[in-house]
Amino acid sequence: MKKTLVSMLTLAVLLGSLSLNAQTTDIKPPKNSILSGQQQIMNEKAPSPLPPIDESNVMWKKTVIREIDFRQKINQVFYYPINPTEDWRNLITVIYDGINSGDITPYRVENNIDDMVTPLTRDDFEKENVKVGDPPVIWNEELGTEVPNEIAFKDRMLNVTRLRIKEDWYFDKKMSQFLVRIIALGPIVVDDDGGLSQVCWIPYEPSRPVLAKAFAFNRNNSAQRRTYDEVLQKRIFDSYIIKEENVYDRYINSYAFNIDALYESERIKNEMFDFEQSLWEY
């Protein structure tokens, strides 16, 4: 009789434990927003295809480099949030995550040229962009080898407050349109001494699948979600030209200073606008 009672009690305890485990397994994580499922939808999204360019139809082209300052209100979507959340990551975090996953390949900033020539591995990228004064590598006791100093690297990446965009403006005579095509992105770090340093070049076209799956914060309506690719393609930012292609290969700040540099930037922009208008007859 006692054995039967003990067996029944043991069975009851086991059944209760299984029931509790089943209930625990069935518990779903709470939603942080009514739009919490939007990121999963975005993970399947591909960037909008760009029209192919027939080089024989390009009758005019100018390459310019412009700079986006994240301190401007309209451009703050590129800098915030500093700490990633379920739905939002700032642009440099999106780029770094893409480099970590192998979906984005950074290129070294070469001396005196703005072309992408030398690709960087993730380790090389981190070593070359640690905070000034910190060692690029540290000793890892577990691995028994030197590894990139990720703490110093991430500390420096917090100071990415500008973005350079290299782009080609061109006139397609077949389509009769004045168009622009982004070539590369260049994050800019403000160092402790106030100097500006470009950390790398990111080729835009191969990076679009990553940028098209990351939301940029919409301060006016968080239900209308835009990706970083859409923000860049739709030109939802403010910027100023810092260089146009020229025979001396000079940046504006090498021959114009302070207010004169702004005037020169506006002159280049107006010159491009006037060229487009001069193509039409009214």
Each language-model region and where it sits:
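Bacterial Sec-dependent N-terminal signal peptides
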Residues: 1-31
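Short conserved micro-motifs at the rims of enzyme active sites and ligand-binding pockets
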Residues: 17, 176, 213-215
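A domain-level signal for the mature, folded cores of soluble proteins
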Residues: 23-171, 205-282
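Mid-length scaffold segments of soluble, non-membrane domains
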Residues: 138, 157, 178, 193-195
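Extracytoplasmic
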Residues: 158-160, 180-182, 197-199
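Short, solvent-exposed beta-strand/turn "edge" segments of beta-rich domains on protein surfaces
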Residues: 172-178
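KE-rich/KEKE low-complexity, intrinsically disordered/coiled-coil-prone tracts
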Residues: 190-193, 201, 212-214
